[in-house]
Design a protein with these regions (language model features):
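Generic helix N-cap/helix-start motif at coil->alpha-helix transitions
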Residues: 3-9, 37-42, 77-86, 109-118, ...
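Alpha-helical segment of the N-proximal tetratricopeptide repeat
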Residues: 6-40, 44-56, 88
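"A position-specific structural signal for the A-helix of alpha-solenoid helical repeats
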Residues: 10, 44-48, 88, 118, ...
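Helix-turn-helix repeat elements of alpha-solenoid scaffolds
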Residues: 14-26, 53-67, 90-100, 123-135, ...
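Flexible helix-coil transition and linker loops at the boundaries of alpha-helical arrays
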Residues: 28-39, 67-82, 104-107, 139-149, ...
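Short coil/turn linking the two alpha-helices of tandem helical-hairpin repeats
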Residues: 46, 50-55, 76, 124-128, ...
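TPR/TPR-like (Sel1-like) alpha-helical repeat modules
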Residues: 64-70, 110-112, 142, 169-180, ...
Length: 294
């Protein structure tokens, strides 16, 4: 039966999803004979071989991935690029117990530190490379938390648009608890600045449900965290982190304002509950001291 290129690609993708590797590999070899210069056919065929996790199949996977790199200009899928293909080759090398080769590829292909967790994991398997592993893992942990923070804020924004206040509260509370487990107690650091935003969002959720006492307590915590951070600003990633082992002096940053207290102002200004939040914020400032306006 004649099969089009599009049908062949779809069937290869289905084999990847269904994990039908043996049948998938046989099918891949058939369509590769017909479409040897089609990027999608070559790439998804390589992926089928790689998914087998069988060391004997990895050389063929690598061969096909390398061929896919030669055809990369045909690629139209946003989630696939030269970096993802190189990572695929590295994974194949891991299955072949060629760990050093895998690490070398991952290091060369480590744009914005995206492979730090992969490199750290592989290095951690060798006792002699523990120090280097911890350096990569430390950087990966900080990057992952930063990404997680922004992901959760994105969720909170989306749930806010949906008027799903309970989910906003749940995900922000979970994020704040997760962050608190990663830091040393009583050490002021960049996570205090992050908490200012989280506490202010939680105040917003309470005020939207007419829980003014709850909103007061969250704004009080936001104020305390902001004043603590602004008194001794520290953006260094290594400050106060439980599991940080890197020697560099990397720093965190955001676009929420010059001071932590400005974060409270920015969130209130953008809130649909601005009037009520400002009334309670004024009360917090009057009762605890400090300026209402930033």
């Amino acid at each position: 039966k004649k099969i089009t290129m599009g049908q062949a690609v779809q069937k290869l993708q289905n084999y990847c999803l269904d994990k039908g590797q043996q049948e998938g590999m046989r099918y891949a070899e058939t369509v590769l004979q017909k479409y040897p210069n089609c990027f999608e056919v070559v790439y998804h065929s390589a992926h089928i071989y790689a998914l087998s996790m069988d060391a004997k199949c990895m050389p063929r996977a690598v061969e096909l991935y390398e061929r896919a790199l030669e055809l990369i200009d045909q690629n139209e899928e946003d989630q696939i690029n030269a970096s993802t293909i190189q990572n695929g080759i590295a994974q194949c090398y891991c299955c072949m117990n060629r760990t050093d080769d895998a690490i070398e590829i991952l290091k060369k292909n480590n744009f914005e530190g995206k492979n730090n967790y992969r490199i750290g994991l592989l290095l951690s398997r060798d006792k002699k490379k523990t120090k280097e592993a911890l350096q990569y893992l430390s950087d990966a942990l900080c990057r992952s938390y930063g990404e997680l923070y922004n992901i959760c804020i994105g969720y909170a924004n989306a749930y806010g648009h949906m008027k799903d206040v309970n989910r906003v509260r749940d995900i922000v509370l979970w994020l704040q608890k997760t962050g608190s487990e990663l830091r040393k107690p009583d050490v002021v650091n960049w996570m205090d600045r992050g908490d200012v935003g989280l506490f202010t969002i939680l105040a917003e959720t309470d005020i939207s449900q007419r829980n003014e006492q709850g909103a007061y307590q969250w704004l009080l915590r936001a104020k305390e965290s902001a004043e603590k951070f602004d008194a001794a600003p520290c953006y260094r990633l290594d400050a106060g982190m439980k599991f940080y082992h890197n020697d560099d002096k990397a720093t965190s940053y955001d676009d929420m304002g010059e001071t932590a207290k400005e974060i409270i102002e920015k969130i209130m200004k953008d809130s649909s509950e601005e009037k009520a939040l400002r009334r309670i914020w004024k009360k917090v400032c009057e009762e605890t001291g400090g300026k209402e306006k930033v």
